[in-house]
Amino acid sequence: MQEDLKIFFGKIMEDDKQRILRICSVYAKNPEDRKDLFQDVALNIWKALPSFRKEAGIDTWIYRICLNVCMQHSLKFKKITQSTIDIDGIAISDDCNIYNNIENAERIKKLYSCIAQLNEADKLLVLLFLEDLPYKIMSDITGFTENHVAVKLNRVKKKLFNCLNV
């Protein structure tokens, strides 16, 4: 049983590591904090693994744990007032010219800064949207109806558009 959990946990970490890191990068300001937050998420997934009941999909379950840990971190330490992103970690293909690379990095940095200014519920929806999740899964994770998810996302997109174009 314990060995099966270890294998299952390893598969989860292998499959979802990048997704978890992206979410952690919104809630943690610097690379060290992101690593710590990632470790907290992994630990919470490991602790909760025996209680996984398969009522929701594994991805939905992992999102819930990840987002709950990240939001608790944000509330506990109050570190996120204005987010910054480490642009060294952004992978940009070598065949683009340098000016496009700089422009893209600046746009991404500005987007993360705008996301950091949102309230927790809006920030959560944006993160789920950026993960390209269907409204049904967003609804399962947040507890909002699918229609409410769509309405809130539309409003948040307008807020982000305004923030990005200031």
Q: What does each model-found stretch correspond to?
A:
Residues 36-43, 56-68:
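Structural recognition of an alpha-helix C-terminal capping motif at a helix-to-coil junction
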